[in-house]
Amino acid sequence: MDISKLKPGDNHYQAYVGPPAQYDFMGATQFRLLCTLGLRAHHYLLDFGCGSLRSGRLFLSYLDEGRYFGIEPNKWLIEDSISNQVGKDLIELKKPRFDYNSDFKTDVFSEQFDFIVAQSIFSHTGRDIIATAMRNMKESLKPDGLIVATFIEGIKDYDGNGWVYPDCVKYSPVTIKRFAKETGLFASRIPWFHPRQTWYLFGRNKSRLPNKVMRRYLAGAVLFEPEFAASWKKSQQIIRFIKKYTTLILP
């Protein structure tokens, strides 16, 4: 099958989860981000909405045996990924655990996680599901753990409920931080590059979130790839603006 002819949402394991042409990048950028945030091989990771193991195939190779956990209602996505790219040998070696519930439950593994990643989940959920999911994630998060999630930012908040895939919904930064506060979590918007969404970090303790110095290293830039040139050109524009502004106000 010619993957380039597929559209996001098509019935193929590399297309159902997003733009098939960016399947490789969207998996790799999650892996890079979590490693930058301190993910080590011994940590427990929950891939919330793991889909076709787009990033999971990288985490599986990196993490120790029994440290990768995935929740995905569409079981066929995981099965197709194992058959076509991950391989049964890696599954047997690393012994990941999967659950197929569609109720956004995270306690099904009876584990506490160092990291919970939810890429492009809250871009398809109403307020009711966000509240449920974040509450469940908090209960399954270690005291010094991190929730790493994306949202599509907008001026006007989506006012509906339920799961709206493949449609997308938007929330303002103020509303996103309110979701966190209502759950008893601290939130931080980070500048890590995403082609369509914005990355947020949530933690039980504010000290677990990156400070201003650390945030400088959370860019996620991709060099020498025209498709993702915005990942570093935007940063360059900001730097030039700051330098120009500084020369204007300083003697």
Q: Model-predicted segments: where are they?
A:
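A short SAM/SAH-binding and catalytic strip from SAM-dependent methyltransferases
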Residues: 115-128
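Conserved class I S-adenosyl-L-methionine
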Residues: 42-51
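Short glycine-centered segments of the SAM/dcSAM-binding site in methyltransferase folds
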Residues: 44, 144-146
